[in-house]
Swiss-Prot record:
Designated name of the protein: Membrane protein insertase YidC
GO BP, sorted A to Z: protein insertion into membrane; protein transport
CDD domains on file: 5TM_YidC_Alb3, EcYidC-like_peri
Location relative to the cell: Cell inner membrane
Annotated Gene Ontology cellular component terms: plasma membrane
Keyword terms, alphabetized: Cell inner membrane, Cell membrane, Chaperone, Membrane, Protein transport, Transmembrane, Transmembrane helix, Transport
Gene that this sequence comes from: yidC
Similarity comment text for this entry: Belongs to the OXA1/ALB3/YidC family. Type 1 subfamily.
Originating species: Xylella fastidiosa (strain 9a5c)
Gene Ontology MF terms in the entry: membrane insertase activity
PANTHER family, per the entry: CYTOCHROME C OXIDASE ASSEMBLY PROTEIN COX18, MITOCHONDRIAL (PTHR12428:SF65), OXA1 (PTHR12428)
Length: 565
């Protein structure tokens, strides 16, 4: 296999892979527990509280029309921290704006609305209680703020803000719910304290759910739609099953999800942002995916609680509402939560992506520019792979030198391709030319290239991050197509330096001639950060190849003059 053919194969593999990433379906091969099966607690979990002994379908999802009919107007509390602005009604987080993430770079642009009470595309996070043994529980309208009509704001001298709600039943049972916010943090601690002031035991289980109507533009995958590049759907994590996911478009495949999990979490992902329920490690829950009309729901049911008269108990969970910031996610110390930065569903590619981002983030801390960090990453990778690349360049230089002899062989054997191939291989063997010399370095770069693609697509840290001049957002495509045009020029120049094999098939030769144009068109639709990587990498490759060819030519001239033996 010659170098030109290797480049051709690599090019078509790249195009095919990107097309697969654009149109391919995300499949999960998971074994789900039947929705009709009664769930108990795994004895190996050794949990204090049990998962409710119920069928997954025993508590049907209420229709939106039913909720509107039974729920009177509920007082809504406004809360503002340094990073979030929210609306709470005690039962749900109805809306959440991300104050540090504007929708665009335009002056005065509004912040990203992650949770929203938009009637067309509602997206909320809810936690409540379901009765067992006819115990009274709060409904949508009965969690009341302790200080009605008060708006809460995290003051400049505050690091912590607590927003309390309370529910009290006629029989003396009460639940005090607190939402705790911390400065600079997107994880909200929601804590319920149940006090039984009645005369009979109180039995109920807690549920926590995320519910949204997906916006159409995240369901329609297209190379011109940045929001569809990333995975959009539900993900969950367990000790046994690891990281699993289900796209919105495939939400109820295999019957949804119905599984008992301890020590995990569940989330809804979209481009750059996510919401997640993170329960206590020592409590098991029933993990569910369900649909209610146009709503997709990710829910945790359980644990169940029995509170004796005169006693009290507490349960708490974290609700993440925010961006996929690697540093902040790491600080939560939740196993597997770093996978929401979804570089790949494949563990190896995800690890490569995490490593590339680690290097990029450190380069950015030194250079204070994500674009120059990408340039620095290219330089480091070229240095690391130079020993491998040197063989590729030397092979190309030798191939270029022996092109006239290969052409002579082709003319000598004419249409007898078998004899021509035999003579060509004998020449390669005699002159110690390795036609596979350019293959391995290119194969090494393929996983790096694809992992970097997902790093640039997924990393919210690069969102709206400029490089210089016309590149003002490295996660969107080049607005003036300058980088794709540069890529065409660089690939064309590289082809001119690379010898065309004498025995190359004419059709393959024509395909190689149009390959720079194909790659240029493809680069017009990828993030400009990836196009920058490819242009810098190709430019360095061109310079090194030119230098190696020149060095080899000088060496050959000196040897022919007798200066080198």
């Amino acid at each position: 296999m010659n170098q030109t053919r290797v480049l051709l194969i690599f090019s078509w593999l790249t195009v095919a892979t990107l097309l697969w990433m654009d149109w391919g379906k995300n499949k999960n091969e998971t074994l789900e527990i039947s929705a009709s099966q009664n769930l108990g607690v795994d004895s190996n979990l050794e949990l204090e509280h049990a998962v409710p002994q119920i069928n997954a379908g025993a508590v049907p999802v209420q229709k939106d029309s039913q909720l509107i009919a039974v729920a009177p107007k509920v007082p809504v509390i406004n809360v503002k921290t340094d990073v979030l602005q929210l609306k709470l009604d005690g039962f749900s987080v109805l809306a959440a704006d991300l104050l540090r993430f504007p929708q665009s770079k335009d002056r005065g642009a509004k912040p990203i609305k992650l949770l929203t009470d938009d009637p067309n595309y509602p997206y909320s996070a809810t936690t409540g209680w379901v009765s067992q043994s006819n115990s009274p529980v709060p409904n949508l309208s009965t969690f009341l703020p302790e200080q009605p009509g008060v708006s809460y704001k995290l003051a400049n001298d505050q690091d912590r803000l607590v927003v309390p709600f309370v529910w009290t039943a006629a029989n003396g049972v009460s639940i005090r719910r607190t939402f705790t916010f911390e400065r600079g943090r997107y994880a909200i601690l929601i804590r319920d304290e149940i006090r039984n002031g009645g005369e009979t035991p109180w039995n109920a289980y807690v549920f926590r759910k995320l519910s949204r109507v997906p916006i159409p533009n995240i369901l329609n995958r297209a190379m011109t739609n940045p929001d569809s590049f990333s995975f959009n759907g539900a993900v969950w994590y367990s000790e046994k099953g690891g990281y699993e996911r289900r796209a919105f478009k495939d939400y109820m495949n295999d019957g949804g999800l119905n599984r008992e999990i301890g020590g995990g979490w569940i989330a809804l992902l979209q481009h750059h942002f996510f919401t997640a329920w993170i329960p206590q490690k020592d409590q098991a829950s029933l993990y569910l995916l369900a649909q209610n009309g146009s709503r997709d729901i990710a829910e945790l049911r359980g644990p169940a609680f029995t509170v004796a008269p005169g006693q009290s108990t507490t349960t708490e969970a974290r609700l993440w509402v925010g961006p996929k910031l690697v540093e902040q996610i790491t600080k939560e110390h939740v196993k597997g939560l770093d996978r929401v930065v979804d570089y790949s569903r494949f563990q190896l590619m995800a690890l490569i992506g995490q490593g590339l981002f680690w290097i990029l983030s450190h380069l950015n801390s030194l250079l204070h520019n994500w674009g120059w960090a990408i340039v620095g990453l290219v330089v480091l990778l070229r240095i690391a792979m130079y020993p491998l690349s040197a063989a590729q360049y030397k092979s190309a230089a030798k191939m270029r030198k022996f092109q006239p002899r290969l052409q002579q062989l082709k003319e000598r054997y004419g249409e007898d391709r078998q004899k021509f191939q035999q003579a060509m291989m004998e020449l390669y063997k005699k002159e110690k030319i390795n036609p596979m010399g350019g293959c391995f370095p290119i194969l090494i770069q393929m996983p790096i290239f694809f992992a970097l693609y997902w790093v640039l697509v997924e990393s919210v840290e690069l969102r709206q991050a400029p490089w210089l001049g016309w590149i003002q957002d490295l996660t969107t495509r080049d607005p003036y197509f300058i980088l794709p045009l540069l890529n065409i020029v660089i690939m064309w120049a590289t082809q001119k330096l690379t010898p065309t094999p004498a025995g190359m098939d004419p059709i393959a030769g024509k395909m190689m001639q149009v390959m720079p144009l194909i790659f240029g068109v493809m680069m017009a639709f990828v993030p400009s950060g990836l196009a920058l990587y490819w242009v810098i990498n190709g430019g360095l490759n061109l310079l090194i190849q030119w230098w190696m060819i020149r060095q080899h030519a000088d060496f050959s001239r000196k040897r022919s003059r007798g200066n080198i033996k």
